[in-house]
């Protein structure tokens, strides 16, 4: 009997990274079907009660992306708190290794906010390749991916919730859940039935169908935690 690689082994991580790469490439092929999203409004001056740090999906213009914008709009409707936003700065193209650029940018911003706005509750989110970006930020560093800005342990307390949509790690061995148990209870990881990026389905429309049902669901989850 051939032994299977265990979840924290180098072989397991390398295999998960390869599977994520192929899934993100597939998401890129479907990205042309996405509607052009509105850019996120700028956050108000000073430190907000909460801030959403969101990584958009493959092929979307800079900003929060369509799913991120809908999620933030719903969250604002469900709470009387001030909600700031930050769109993760990364290429969001077909090169999965560029997701590490987004992870470094998100981590740097999270650490800046934790230092400058200590009372602000941080919400991390991502759609499709953007969900993989957040996986990298919150997971143990993966060798060879170019992630060089791991979060210090003190940052964990500032992260109130994580909302992920169409996450490729759902088909790559559950990367996030295996490596980041401390965030498990804070995370809502949504996958549409039939979405080929996060499940074994083959319905590309499912990958584009997170608004408004699941963005509202995620907003309800997050609103109770900020």
Swiss-Prot record:
Superkingdom assignment:
Bacteria
Q: Where mainly found?
A: membrane
EC number(s) per entry = 3.1.1.-
Quick one: a GO biological-process term for this protein?
lipid catabolic process
Which is an annotated GO molecular function term of this record? hydrolase activity, acting on ester bonds
* UniProt activity-regulation remark: Inhibited by high concentrations of paraoxon. Inhibited by tetrahydrolipstatin (THL), a specific lipase inhibitor.
Site for Transition state stabilizer, residues: 129
The reply to whether tRNA processing figures as a keyword in the UniProt entry is: no
Which residues are named in the active-site annotation? 128, 195, 207
- Report the subcellular localization: Cell membrane; Secreted, Cell wall
Q: What is the purpose of this protein?
A: A2-type phospholipase, which is probably involved in the degradation of macrophage membrane. Hydrolyzes dipalmitoylphosphatidylcholine. Also shows moderate esterase activity and hydrolyzes the p-nitrophenol-linked aliphatic ester pNP-butyrate (C4). Does not exhibit cutinase activity.
What PANTHER family does the annotation carry? CUTINASE 4, CUTINASE RV1984C-RELATED-RELATED
Family recorded in the similarity comment:
Belongs to the cutinase family.
Name the record gives this protein: Phospholipase Culp4
UniProt organism field: Mycobacterium tuberculosis (strain ATCC 25618 / H37Rv)
């Amino acid at each position: 009997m051939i032994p299977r690689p265990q979840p924290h082994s180098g072989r397991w991580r390398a295999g998960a990274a390869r599977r994520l790469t192929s899934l993100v490439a597939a998401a890129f092929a479907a990205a042309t079907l996405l509607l052009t999203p509105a850019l996120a409004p700028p956050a108000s001056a000073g430190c907000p009660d909460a801030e959403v740090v969101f990584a958009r999906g493959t092929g979307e213009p800079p900003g929060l992306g369509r799913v991120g914008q809908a999620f933030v709009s719903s969250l604002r409707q469900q709470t009387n708190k001030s909600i700031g936003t930050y769109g993760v700065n990364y290429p969001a193209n077909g090169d999965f290794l560029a997701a590490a650029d987004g992870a470094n940018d998100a981590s740097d911003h999270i650490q800046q906010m934790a230092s400058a706005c200590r009372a602000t509750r941080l919400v991390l989110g991502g759609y499709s390749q953007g969900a993989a970006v957040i996986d990298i930020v919150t997971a143990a560093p993966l060798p060879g991916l170019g992630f060089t800005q791991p979060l210090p342990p003190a940052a964990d307390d500032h992260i109130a919730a994580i909302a992920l949509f169409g996450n490729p790690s759902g088909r790559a061995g559950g990367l996030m859940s295996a490596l980041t148990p401390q965030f498990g209870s804070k995370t809502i990881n949504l996958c549409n039935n039939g979405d080929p990026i996060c499940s074994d389905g083959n319905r590309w429309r499912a990958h584009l169908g997170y608004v408004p049902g699941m963005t509202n669901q995620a907003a309800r989850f997050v609103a109770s935690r900020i």
